[in-house]
UniProtKB/Swiss-Prot annotation:
Positions where N6-lipoyllysine occurs in the chain: K65
This protein's name: Glycine cleavage system H protein
Span of domain Lipoyl-binding: 24-105
GO biological process, any: glycine decarboxylation via glycine cleavage system
PROSITE patterns reported for this sequence: BIOTINYL_LIPOYL (PS50968), LIPOYL (PS00189)
Lineage summary: Bacteria, Pseudomonadati, Pseudomonadota, Betaproteobacteria, Burkholderiales
Chain's role: The glycine cleavage system catalyzes the degradation of glycine. The H protein shuttles the methylamine group of glycine from the P protein to the T protein.
Gene transcribed to yield this protein: gcvH
Native source organism of the sequence: Burkholderia orbicola (strain MC0-3)
Length: 126
């Protein structure tokens, strides 16, 4: 069974989301996603400053088995990317919840209401 921390929010597309003290959201891929993909060999992340809508494909994660889009969980502006993750994408396999991919600032009027909690995500992947 995959590890699903209770303090995070999730998407149906297997991204995890952590709300930071300053209100920005930190986004990564779940343990289930990295396990399903296998050995991750490449990450393409969005550009800092880019405005995105919820559900937009903003990046790609490639493994030895497949390539999969990374989606924005909310509408907003990309404010940071984890360049260390692009340099060592295999680190996501070892610590999916410790290796974040990008940070996003919510757009005015956007919310996190459509994100799911750990219980709902656990049911989705079981």
């Amino acid at each position: 069974m995959s590890n699903v921390p209770a303090d995070l929010k999730y998407t149906d597309e297997h991204e995890w989301i952590r709300t930071e003290a300053d209100g920005t959201l930190t986004v990564g891929i779940t343990d289930h996603a990295q396990s399903t993909l296998g050995d991750i060999v490449f990450l393409e992340l969005p550009e800092v400053g880019k405005s995105v809508n919820a559900g937009d494909a903003v990046g790609v994660v490639e493994s030895v088995k497949a390539a999969s889009d990374i989606y924005s969980p909310v509408s907003g502006e990309i404010v940071a990317i984890n360049e260390a993750a692009t340099d060592a994408p295999e680190d996501v396999n070892g610590d999916a919840y410790g290796v974040w991919l990008f940070k996003i600032k919510l757009a005015a009027g956007a919310s996190i209401d459509k994100l799911i909690d750990a219980d709902a995500y656990s049911k989705l992947i079981d």
